[in-house]
Amino acid sequence: MRVPFSWLKAYVPELESPEVLEERLAGLGFETDRIERVFPIPRGVVFARVLEAHPIPGTRLKRLVLDAGQAVEVVSGAENARKGIGVALALPGTELPGLGQKVGERVIQGVRSFGMALSPRELGVGEYGGGLLEFPEDALPPGTPLAEAWPEEVVLDLEVTPNRPDALGLLGLARDLHALGYALVEPEAALKAEALPLPFALKVEDPEGAPHFTLGYAFGLRVAPSPLWMQRALFAAGMRPINNVVDVTNYVMLERAQPMHAFDLRFIGEGILVRRARPGERLRTLDGVERTLHPEDLVIAGWRGEESFPLGLAGVMGGAESEVREDTEAIALEVACFDPVSIRKTARRHGLRTEASHRFERGVDPLGQVPAQRRALSLLQALAGARVAEALLEAGSPKPPEAIPFRPEYANRLLGTSYPEAEQIAILKRLGCRVEGQGPAYRVTPPSHRLDLRLEEDLVEEVARIQGYETIPLALPAFFPAPDNRGVEAPYRKERRLRELLSGLGFQEVYTYSFMDPEDARRFRLDPPRLLLLNPLAPEKAALRTHLFPGLVRVLKENLDLDRPERALLFEVGRVFREREETHLAGLLFGEGVGLPWAKERLSGYFLLKGYLEALFARLGLAFRVEAQVFPFLHPGVSGRVLVEGEEVGFLGALHPEIAQELELPPVHLFELRLPLPDKPLAFQDPSRHPAAFRDLAVVVPAPTPYGEVEALVREAAGPYLESLVLFDLYQGPPLPEGHKSLAFHLRFRHPKRTLRDEEVEEAVSRVAEALRARGFGLRGLDTP
């Protein structure tokens, strides 16, 4: 958020300097990313009035006759160049920061141009370069250096935390500074309203989407450029001035963190209707884009008789049809409180994030709509000559904040401080809280704009924040004999061991939020989450997660959107929340498998990830196998359950292709295991010094037979001297019988104390062959072609 120092100083006149302000805001919890000096306007730029504007035949240029203290002519190609406006004129010899060159006197299309009429970009005050910077024609005496009325500004770029939506308005920051002891000058709403009937009606069909909605009426407007002070403030805050009516709505939004919108009264019909969009409805928004509306979009509509038509996306952006124009004379002024979840979903659906939607998504003061109406209408009176109706149309009854018990003694105990009771109460009052009762227990009602104050601990935190965290005394913790935590620490040691082993195998650890989007339960074909948050930070963090793997998939998706890594190996150890809280380990593999020429392309990643798990469990000394099983979120032909020491602990497989397609992801393989893993005492065994004996075996089995079943059979029959078993070939096709496949294994035998004799190895292989035949399997080359 951009905070112009001079604008904030209008509310807090005692502010010493931008540097002191940065320090004060840091103590209040608002980090400054940078301090920027803007508007270095050269002395050679003066204010000028456009007396005449004549098109130059055969071109899109105009010859302007200006009064800049003396009559001068310039050539301009700006569409908005016209008689009766004020402009910024760069005289010959002026070096412009927005151009990086000096302005000269030139002949253009046979007209001598004495300088240059400037756009905001050319003047260096804004990014917009499509037209002249417009001022009221009487803003300054002609020829006055613009820098005298538009001095250099210092802007602080702040990080505002999600729990403080009120601080997205300068008045919210000013109130916090007031709590530090600075005097606060609240902006006045000197409104001269008239007792007039309103020429429109208000209907709200969706009170959940718009719990509080107000409409004001202003007429007799003179739409014109805003005065210099307002344009300077808006440019400094990062917004482009449009005209005095639209600029007032943006100015009050930046002041109070309360977005608002003005509708040209000629285009709303009989009144304003707040409803959900109809299927197939279309709306051209102010950015010129024709949008097809979604039935869940909350819209502001007008109506005539039985016909209703959309005027804007509620809380996001207005429609082009009802925007304020040069000839607008009357407006309906919307100031509302919308459901944050609804606004966020609409903004995301349409890829349309605006200053208004940003504030509505965080939440606005539920009681702030009427004061914002009065403030905006008073500015319209002052700047646009508006007449204002005293009455407001209002729908909804916002709920005032509830009182919170507060005990100063508890605050000191919680913080480890000894702040005086009177000082704590004074801080809460300076923050705008209403304090009732007597000590030791008070009842504190927070101001309606502080949506984050709900608990006694919130008030304690406010006391510490305003007093300054540096005033909390440092104290060494008390030292006690260390308890015997071996039983408690064991799971953490095992988790640390897992992390070390996976990192050694090339995996990268990630940390994701413990929250999930309830919509992900549908997207990933999971059971609905059991635990929903009452006050989530965002809709996509509204439930406690039930699995880890969706978070890993999201991490991969975000990285693929930014870059295109060839390969990714990710893992996470974290808590999930089902019938009870559990710790899980999840991993993800993305990218082509290597060293697996025998595997089908869709299986190579699966076998590679399975190999990583085999290596992991071999290092842990645990028996591991995978048995085929279908999971709704995994590829039905590439999935299985994971068994460790015979106990089912999780799953392994490829993400279901339909889910991958919905997320626009390439093939992804993943696993998730429940921790802690089954225990098995580790016994050290000397590496054998004796040579190994090798045999290859090709087993022919029906195609649906799971690999794990064959592997388990071979291991059991081979006896105690089988050291390792590796699948090195998978084949289907002639000359094998139809519906069969061949699995070829490397078998390695070794005795720990001596060299194995050939007859011992052959006996073990014979036992394997007999066990396979007894199960109905054959040996390739002996029992089958």
UniProtKB/Swiss-Prot annotation:
UniProt KW Nucleotide-binding keyword: yes
Cofactor binding: number and manner: Binds 2 magnesium ions per tetramer.
Family matches, as SUPFAM superfamilies: Anticodon-binding domain of PheRS, Class II aaRS and biotin synthetases, Nucleic acid-binding proteins, PheT/TilS domain, Putative DNA-binding domain
GO MF entries: ATP binding; magnesium ion binding; phenylalanine-tRNA ligase activity; tRNA binding
Pfam families per record: B3_4 (PF03483), B5 (PF03484), FDX-ACB (PF03147), tRNA_synthFbeta (PF17759)
One Gene Ontology cellular component: phenylalanine-tRNA ligase complex
The B5 domain, residue ranges: 399-474
Gene Ontology BP terms: phenylalanyl-tRNA aminoacylation
Keyword Metal-binding (UniProt): yes
InterPro entries, A to Z: aa-tRNA-synth_II/BPL/LPL (IPR045864), B3/B4_tRNA-bd (IPR005146), DNA-bd_dom_put_sf (IPR009061), Fdx_antiC-bd (IPR005121), Fdx_antiC-bd_sf (IPR036690), NA-bd_OB-fold (IPR012340), Phe-tRNA-ligase_IIc_bsu (IPR045060), Phe-tRNA-ligase_IIc_bsu_bact (IPR004532)
FDX-ACB domain: residues covered: 688-780
Binding site for Mg(2+): D452, D458, E461, E462
Reaction(s) this enzyme catalyzes, per UniProt: tRNA(Phe) + L-phenylalanine + ATP = L-phenylalanyl-tRNA(Phe) + AMP + diphosphate + H(+)
UniProt xrefs under Gene3D superfamilies: 3.30.56.10, Bira Bifunctional Protein, Domain 2, Ferrodoxin-fold anticodon-binding domain, Nucleic acid-binding proteins, Phenylalanyl-trna Synthetase, Chain B, domain 3
Protein's cellular compartments: Cytoplasm
Enzyme class at the top of the EC tree: ligase
Residue stretches making up the tRNA-binding domain: 39-147
Keywords: Aminoacyl-tRNA synthetase, ATP-binding, Cytoplasm, Ligase, Magnesium, Metal-binding, Nucleotide-binding, Protein biosynthesis, RNA-binding, tRNA-binding
Record-linked PANTHER family: PHENYLALANINE--TRNA LIGASE BETA SUBUNIT (PTHR10947:SF0), PHENYLALANYL-TRNA SYNTHETASE BETA CHAIN AND LEUCINE-RICH REPEAT-CONTAINING PROTEIN 47 (PTHR10947)
Subunit structure: Tetramer of two alpha and two beta subunits.
Similarity annotation: Belongs to the phenylalanyl-tRNA synthetase beta subunit family. Type 1 subfamily.
Protein name: Phenylalanine--tRNA ligase beta subunit
Native species: Thermus thermophilus (strain ATCC BAA-163 / DSM 7039 / HB27)
Gene name for this UniProt entry: pheT
